[in-house]
Amino acid sequence: MNKTQVPSLITSQSWYVIDAKNQKLGRMSTHISNILRGKNKPSYTPYLDTGDYVIVINSSEVSVSGNKTTQKLYRRHSGQPGGLKVETFEQLQTRLPNRIVEKSVKGMLPKGPLGRKLFTKLKVYPGPSHPHAAQKPQEYMV
């Protein structure tokens, strides 16, 4: 069977920086997942990793609309009987601000081996600095 897309012709992967300060979580996560998948490129192929790397800074200052700061719940389970832990958006943002953006983007990626590979290309930092200056990332406006 002949393929119309030749995998060796895929362009190189670039790096983008997204500032999460005062950005809505869902809208920003949609842009991030599209970049990770490679849907912003003409060489997009659903079964290949054609996406770019994304660095998110200021993840501790991401916002949500409405009453989600007090009403949105994040659940995790330890595996033990009675081991369900529940946290609100506000509590999780003070404890682990990176986890909010990571969980939001991970839910928008494909489930399976390709999605796990794409998720490793997301780098999230709570402050304004990141250690990826050597990659010369481009500013991406959401």
From Swiss-Prot:
Disulfide bonds: none
Organism superkingdom: Eukaryota
GO-annotated cellular components: chloroplast; cytosolic large ribosomal subunit
Keywords, sorted A to Z: Chloroplast, Plastid, Ribonucleoprotein, Ribosomal protein
Cellular compartments annotated: Plastid, Chloroplast
Family annotation (PROSITE patterns): RIBOSOMAL_L13
Subunit structure, as described in the record: Part of the 50S ribosomal subunit.
Protein name per the record: Large ribosomal subunit protein uL13c
Organism: Porphyra purpurea
Lineage of producing organism: Eukaryota, Rhodophyta, Bangiophyceae, Bangiales, Bangiaceae
